[in-house]
Design a protein with these regions (language model features):
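Bacterial Sec-dependent N-terminal signal peptides
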Residues: 1-9
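Mobile, glycine-rich extracellular loop/lid and propeptide segments
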Residues: 192-200
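N-terminal low-complexity, Pro/Thr-rich disordered segments
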Residues: 8-12, 18-60, 75, 85-97, ...
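Proline-anchored loop/turn motifs at beta-strand termini and strand-loop-strand connectors
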Residues: 63-71
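A short acidic/glycine-rich loop-to-helix N-cap element
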Residues: 208-224
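Short, solvent-exposed coil/turn segments at beta-strand boundaries
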Residues: 172-174, 199-205
Length: 238
């Protein structure tokens, strides 16, 4: 079975200013009353939609081996059109974390890495979504993690039972969430645990997933997530 992991970069939203208008009344020659003509009501300008991330921005947000602790090396990250499907619709955002394509997204750069001993894997992917899609995607993952403690995913035609749990980790970008996905493979007597950070900046999303060789390896995730998140946000902000 193949395990896929991806991450994403993002663009900064522009902050808009409030406009304010006031008019002052004059006084009469005889010292009459001063009239206040009133103020125009303050109205916040609509926040403009974030521009899509460019291919250059998405590429710039991808980690390189030199950005990681010693021993990590880059590996090829072949992309396909495979899309994992959850049997329960409310769990689909979690299944999408293990897909090569994200519905409604323009996919950008991606890179995978292996630890020095080849036992731990790290993968990052960046993509951009129109409108509020990026922020909505992060929220949908957070909601699904709370609603889908267990679910069944179909990947490569095979049903795979998955456990999901919210994962406290570093914050990144304008919004982010962490989730741990656990897949049991009885035939291989194997359990795969993947720690995932989903971060949003403007119209961009980063997926950073880490599969450690054992339970002790999970403690390295926060550092790896911060490295990936920092680079993605910097690239997204241009």
């Amino acid at each position: 079975m193949r395990t896929r992991i991806r991450r994403g970069v993002a663009v900064a939203l522009t902050v808009s200013a409030l406009t304010f208008t006031a008019a002052c009344g004059g006084s009469s020659d005889k010292g009459g009353d001063k009239a206040d003509k009133g103020k125009a009501a303050e109205q916040p300008a609509e926040k403009p939609a974030a521009a899509p991330l460019t291919a250059e921005q998405m590429k710039a947000g991808i980690l390189e081996a030199k950005d990681l602790p010693a021993g990590w090396k880059a590996e090829s990250a072949p992309s396909t059109d495979d899309q994992a499907k959850a049997e329960k619709p409310e769990c689909q955002p979690l299944a999408q974390l293990m897909s090569d394509k994200i519905d409604g997204a323009t996919m950008g750069g991606n890179q995978e890495f292996a630890s020095a001993d080849g036992a731990s894997l790290l993968a990052q992917q960046i993509f951009t979504m129109p409108g509020t899609g990026a922020a909505d995607f992060v929220k949908s993952v957070e909601t699904a993690a709370a609603a889908c403690a267990t679910f069944t995913m179909v990947q490569d035609g095979q049903p795979v039972p998955v456990k999901a749990a919210a994962l406290p980790t570093v914050k990144s970008g304008e919004s982010s969430t962490g989730v741990r996905l656990t897949m049991e493979i009885p035939e291989l007597k194997m359990k795969i645990e993947s720690d995932v950070l989903i971060a949003q900046q403007g119209s961009g999303v980063m997926r950073l997933a880490y599969v450690p060789m054992n339970g002790e390896g999970h403690k390295a995730f926060d550092d790896l997530a911060k490295r990936g998140g920092d680079k993605f946000v910097k690239a997204a902000q241009g």
